[in-house]
């Protein structure tokens, strides 16, 4: 489940693809057929600097975030792979722009309850994400309380988990509050961190015989430790 360069042109930049692993495929099809398996994070922010949530600053932040976490700008396509059935495609050019009306939405609300109702509908109603749109952010400015903003980050579970999104959210607010920078992270280096979970298994390159041996040794060690615990109990 590693990335492969499949294209490079002036219009798209470099284009990379990789198959989804088993976990990602499960979330992918769960989202398509059941409309679930998406994550919505809701944060309440008070600011004294009105420019923080202007469209230009939020768009700049989202572009920078996609360049750090490139799966935010990926698309998913079903393939003929026998073991996975789908693949991610990341085009370098897509990470440097915002698709109008899709990735960033600036809205207004008159109460906190109104935003909570929106988030509930986002989770329980018709799915707002798709294989072509794996992430988006909604910014609600409170008309009844100037300076108060709700940030709702909506991401497909196939590209992130509950712990990973905490890092992403922290990075989002860091970029939002800092001056612009011209630094663009190396795409290949960032994609190297977005591999399938199977690639993180230290035993994946071992032969079947070696894996069985490792499993047997692990079972023996576990039983010895378990026996010691039982003996030490009063």
Q: Where do the language-model regions lie?
A:
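Non-catalytic N-terminal regions of enzymes
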Residues: 1-203
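Phosphate/pyrophosphate-binding loops and the adjoining catalytic core of nucleotide-dependent enzymes
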Residues: 209-212
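Flexible, P/S/T/G-rich "lid" or insertion loops adjacent to the active sites of thioester-utilizing
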Residues: 214-234
């Amino acid at each position: 489940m590693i990335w492969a360069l499949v294209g490079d042109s002036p219009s798209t930049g470099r284009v990379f693809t990789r198959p989804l692993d088993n976990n990602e495929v499960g979330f992918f099809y769960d989202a398509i057929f059941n409309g679930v398996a998406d994550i919505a994070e809701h944060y309440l922010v008070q600011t004294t600097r009105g420019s923080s949530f202007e469209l230009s600053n939020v768009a700049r932040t989202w572009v920078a975030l996609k360049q750090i976490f490139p799966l935010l700008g990926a698309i998913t396509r079903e393939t003929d792979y026998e073991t996975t059935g789908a693949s991610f495609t990341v085009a370098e050019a897509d990470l440097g722009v915002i698709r109008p009306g899709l990735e960033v939405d600036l809205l207004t609300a008159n109460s906190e309850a109104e935003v909570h109702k929106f988030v509930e509908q986002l989770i329980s109603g018709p799915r707002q994400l798709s294989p072509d749109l794996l992430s988006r952010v909604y910014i609600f400015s409170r008309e009844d309380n100037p300076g108060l903003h709700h940030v709702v980050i909506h991401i497909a579970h196939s590209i992130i988990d509950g712990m990973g999104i905490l890092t992403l959210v922290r990075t989002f607010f860091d970029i939002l509050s800092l001056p612009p920078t011209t630094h663009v992270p190396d795409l290949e280096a960032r994609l190297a961190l977005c591999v399938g979970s199977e690639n993180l298994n230290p035993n994946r390159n071992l032969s079947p015989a070696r894996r069985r041996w490792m499993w047997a040794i692990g079972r023996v060690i576990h039983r010895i430790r378990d026996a010691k615990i039982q003996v030490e109990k009063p």
